[in-house]
Amino acid sequence: MKYYFAPLESISSYPLRNAHARFFSSIDRYFSPFVSANEEGHYTGKIERDLSPQNNQTLTLIPQIMGREVDHMLKSFSYLQDLGYSEANLNLGCPSGTVVAKGKGAGMLRDLYFLEDFFKNLFLKKEKDFAISVKCRIGISDAVAIPELFSLFNQFPFSEVIVHPRVQKQFYKGNVDLDGFQKVYEITKNPLVYNGDIENAETAHKIMELFPSISGIMLGRGLLANPALVREIRGGNELKEKELKDYILAVEKAFSEEIQGDKNLLCKLKECWSYFAKNYPVSIKGIKELRKAKTMEEYRAAKFRIYSEGEFIPFKGEKEWI
């Protein structure tokens, strides 16, 4: 079984990826936050740095690309190939309203005729040795089109089909649709990867029991809260407080080298702590102070309070759903 770190916009960029790979070397593949295909087929700034092989030497990175113009996608693929990549992942899963309104992300699932034509042209024109995987949801407002959608995927040689069994309208709310995923599982001929609400080892094992032929599991928010989750799934030790603290220090240092200005850095670290804090569920005052911190000094004081006053309880999930 393969285990993947999901692409999470703004947070799973190379500073966090490298820190995670350094402390928890159990991930088979990391996926970059999505990059929008463009007419130039070239990227600068933080996207260029995030995709740079020099910034991803200790891990296997699969760039995720979003777009609906075949020519733009091909230019992005060429850019990636020049960097040494041999595969990209197509984003057909982003539920953001602004993205969907443009017919991108999960919005591409609306028109299967367009999608078929898009895939035909993409596979016809791309370099033969460049692999394409796809990450998608199971529909827009309902899952009634699962048979048509995944039969369509079967017509093309995707290296993997990664499925988050929610519809776009759910965003990340409610439960995943395991009945819907069962239908996908029965239809799909390409290698299939499960993604969605894996927050502990027990849930991962149940998914593998229910769907024994899947080729992998992709983890996102659960892995941000418990960076040792895949190690636990593989039968290793559960997360220890010291390694979490050391990991957080490494994340702080890595982002401080990428982000200019304490204000911007503080925003990023608060975002990270929305997940780290799940391991300190009773440290209510310290967590509130950290959220309100306006300077790095206040941030460090709040973090110290969380550590000194709050009991470390390794995160095991917020709900039982399977």
Specify the residue positions occupied by each region the protein language model found:
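Flavin-dependent oxidoreductase catalytic cores
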Residues: 1-322
